[in-house]
Amino acid sequence: MELATASTMSAAAVTRRINAGGLRVEVTNGNGAAGVYVAAAAAPCSPAAKRVNDGGGKDDVWVAVDEADVSGPSGGDGVRPTLFRTYKVKGSILHPYRFLILVRLIAIVAFFAWRVRHKNRDGAWLWTMSMAGDVWFGFSWALNQLPKLNPIKRVADLAALADRQQHGTSGGGELPGVDVFVTTVDPVDEPILYTVNSILSILAADYPVDRYACYLSDDGGTLVHYEAMVEVAKFAELWVPFCRKHCVEPRAPESYFAMKTQAYRGGVAGELMSDRRRVRREYEEFKVRIDSLFSTIRKRSDAYNRAKDGKDDGENATWMADGTHWPGTWFEPAENHRKGQHAGIVQVLLNHPTSKPRFGVAASVDNPLDFSGVDVRLPMLVYISREKRPGYNHQKKAGAMNALLRVSALLSNAPFIINFDCDHYVNNSQAFRAPMCFMLDRRGGGDDVAFVQFPQRFDDVDPTDRYANHNRVFFDGTTLSLNGLQGPSYLGTGTMFRRAALYGLEPPRWGAAGSQIKAMDNANKFGASSTLVSSMLDGANQERSITPPVAIDGSVARDLAAVTACGYDLGTSWGRDAGWVYDIATEDVATGFRMHQQGWRSVYTSMEPAAFRGTAPINLTERLYQILRWSGGSLEMFFSHSNALLAGRRLHPLQRIAYLNMSTYPIVTVFIFFYNLFPVMWLISEQYYIQQPFGEYLLYLVAIIAMIHVIGMFEVKWSGITVLDWCRNEQFYMIGSTGVYPTAVLYMALKLFTGKGIHFRLTSKQTTASSGDKFADLYTVRWVPLLIPTIVVLAVNVGAVGVAVGKAAAWGLLTEQGRFAVLGMVFNVWILALLYPFALGIMGQRGKRPAVLFVATVMAVAAVAIMYAAFGAPYQAGLSGVAASLGKAASLTGPSG
């Protein structure tokens, strides 16, 4: 176990992909006069004085539902106002939306009944498969739609929170402590430049500096990550005061310097440009040091290894800058120094600051930046790499998060926790304050809120969002609608937690204080560390701030070593009833589910600019692997103790349905996959999937399909997404349904029958394409077996369209066979339209010119049609013989859900 204190850091690789979006700087001259936005009645960087009377709701969609609670600083009745606003969808939109859902549900049931009465006995096997698929489609659609019946929007009122602070007993004393967790594993797949920008944005957040701490979990145990943090701590001494002085947004330097214009909200505009140039120059030098870390450490290690007094013990160690062996993993693996086998490490890089401000110095020759009026304190920063040994299941990210939870309890023990993936950063400096509006508002039921979830927003997704990376339909539609129930599921990043909820304690609404204390005293539940157990009641108290600075003496070191040990979880409740849930790939959803079934609530909220932003995989293969892990984890959740059907009465009925939908959605895609392969029948037989009597069938089908699209347009309206977002979501769902989701079902079946767990690879965020094109990854083809099923479906439907054209040409459009061929072709063309982004993706660089795809498709269809007309059409038999050989049409419908 390694413990140390330092004041510096370092990192490597890849220029961050940035979205330059939205903000403008208007600084006209050096004196900060005209055109400069400066807060007049409030200190720079303070929350806007405007109260959120209209917020996100003054439009033709949303209406406020709590007007009486917002009537000035004291609510008009001597009681504090709520710290957030709640909006509901206007009745003129909500009532028709609900009515259409009901009508479609009735139509689906009527359609099933009609099909049962009109069973096709000539194609019984097709009819049976079709009915099974359609029943599941209808059921799956209902699971997805019912939780959306009561969409609610909640908006944090930062001005009300500022009022509460101002009227508090000790200034900002009412803001409780926050521990911020960042997790990373591989410095190559998760480039270090992403990680260091994430940490820098956290250190510069607009939150009382003595009330939050930042923890980085390096699950790979690499010296590169540690020295990157050493460099970060050093550069933060310049970057953080600069951000505070000029109120810059965003506070991740890579994002900030990539923007061409920024809004200025500070008070010293005359110094902005010179300060900015100086800081940018320092940042470029910082990036050079980060980029060179791999080579720097390797050269240093080689030099030390050559100087071992001629001793050759067969080990080539990785050496730290102080001339000692790195206790984690080495470049050249050795016993106790390889992935999955190394000591635990806790390094305190920045100590907890004092409670009193410490102002910087005036500009001088040695220090050209004037920080004389700026608080230059930095938050606590800690590097952690938990112990790993062979023979132990380290539980991936969930295990790392639980180690962070235990270490932070001993060092800072803040009552609230925010977690980030290493490729996300703080995009809005007020982001830590916003969730406090929900956690601290007891009039709004804040005591029962386990976590606040922000949407995930991404930088540098291609302009057309080919692979639905923004996922706005899910975030701003499905997830937002859960606010009307117990709240959204936990989505893995950009989330603030209540520490008590992570410990598995019950919410105040359901649990008595005595039972909570009894739960804390159960040593078997939380492990052998008595110090950890005794800290839990303090950590669960939201009124407290943060643990005073801890002296790292021998007893604390032993406790830290104990709680990061690889076997600490064994025989305890960690991973099931406490902390993040184990043995499920989607540990985030399962952890949120555990809290909801205990009776906790959650809140989904967003803010402008977005609270957090991150990086999404724009490469087709990496995107498919990402949703493979999500869908596989969902199925693991269904076949585990986290099954929504097993939850108790504290889980809202519609919340139960929402979780059931989250854990079963991949199953329905098995039917979709086979539906998409039914066109093979066009190639090997003369059977069609058209139900008889055809007129009634067509009426039902058109009505059901039309209603789902109208319902979708209502959701587009109230969620604020675009039609393109909705279309991309439909397309990528079909892409997943033809390959990824059925593969996840197959993996789950193998796990159930063999008992072996499923290994899902880490989504790579590295860029392998040329640096001249930030979207080059979009046009890079990485051939993997996961692409094959969708390619087969694509080829089958292109062939089916060709056969349909050939049949229509051979028989004529006015014949029954010709009409059926054209009608069947409509289904095939629809499938091809949904798979269009996939087809572009596998074309690689040629995908930059969609016209090439259209020409190739037309040529392929024409070739199949000509071959069918030449070799497959029975011209020689005459019309009567052809009609006799054709046989009767079989039945099958398209999906009803």
Curated annotation (Swiss-Prot):
Pfam (any one): Cellulose_synt
GO cellular component, one term: plasma membrane
Major place of residence: Golgi
Molecular function terms, GO-annotated: cellulose synthase (UDP-forming) activity
Binding-site residues for substrate, renumbered to this chain: 421, 423
E.C. number: 2.4.1.-
Transmembrane segments: 93-113, 123-143, 664-684, 694-714, 732-752, 786-806, 822-842, 851-871
Membrane topology: Multi-pass membrane protein
Active site feature: 219, 588
GO terms for biological process, alphabetical: cell wall organization; cellulose biosynthetic process; plant-type primary cell wall biogenesis
Keywords: Cell wall biogenesis/degradation, Glycosyltransferase, Golgi apparatus, Membrane, Transferase, Transmembrane, Transmembrane helix
Zinc-finger in keyword set: no
Highest taxon, organism lineage: Eukaryota
UniProt keyword annotation of tRNA processing present: no
Role: Catalyzes both beta-1,3 and beta-1,4 glycosidic linkage on beta-D-glucan. Essential for (1,3;1,4)-beta-D-glucans synthesis in grasses and cereals (Poaceae). The mixed-linked glucans (which are not present in walls of dicotyledons or most other monocotyledonous plants) are particularly important constituents of the walls of the starchy endosperm and aleurone cells of cereal grains such as oats, wheat, rice and barley. They can account for up to 70% by weight of the wall.
Stated family: Belongs to the glycosyltransferase 2 family. Plant cellulose synthase-like F subfamily.
Protein name: Mixed-linked glucan synthase 4
Designated gene of the protein: CSLF4
